[in-house]
Amino acid sequence: LFLTGANIGFMPAGNYLGQVLGGQSSRWLLIPIGMLIGYFIVRAEPAVYVLNKQVEEVTDGAISAGTMGAALSAGVALSVGLAMVRVLTGISILWFLIPGYLFAISISFVVPKLYTAIAFDAGGVASGPMTATFLLPLAQGACIAVGGNIVTDAFGVVAMVAMTPLITVQLMGLVAQLKTRKARSAQPLLDTAALLAELPDDAIIEL
């Protein structure tokens, strides 16, 4: 049933939309429109919904489903935008994948391990059936419209979608870690200020 719906609905629609957008005089609009589509299409992934809920339950709400969804949406939007740049310019995918994975692996040494594990799971989940059945035909249709090479320029969208959540989710973890450290460093100052406020006016403090 899913394959029938994908072949009849998603794939032709994605291909047609890509050709329409690529056939416009302002071809650069492919980039922001592709990013917008990527931002919302990941919300339709059933596996993404399940992952977000599981992460929220396991972390007792420390990482909310909404925060996870926003990080994944931002990652997929970025990946689709970069894919449209490839379609328009013909840049090799290696110029994106190699630096991207190197950066993702590099920050994994400073990010809490929980976020690193979640990020790698999120990368696999985000590149699910909706990506393969809609975003890939979208890139193929756009590539046909701009006269590019489908084999070298259109393919690789799924790989990009699998990579960017590794970066966005880990960056989310890095921000959370920095906020935690800042809060801990400020706590002793707050405790001292509260203690001084409770002392009577004639109290003598020995140094």
Functional labels for PLM-detected ranges:
Residues 155, 159-184:
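Membrane-helix cytosolic exit motif
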Residues 2-9, 81-82, 132-149:
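Hydrophobic alpha-helical transmembrane segments in multi-pass integral membrane proteins
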Residues 5, 82-105, 118-127, 151-158:
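Transmembrane helix-loop boundary segments of multi-pass membrane transporters
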Residues 54-62, 174-207:
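Intrinsically disordered, low-complexity non-transmembrane regions of multi-pass membrane transporters
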Residues 2-16, 42-47:
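Transmembrane alpha-helix boundary signature
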Residues 53-61, 108-123, 180:
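Alpha-helical transmembrane segments
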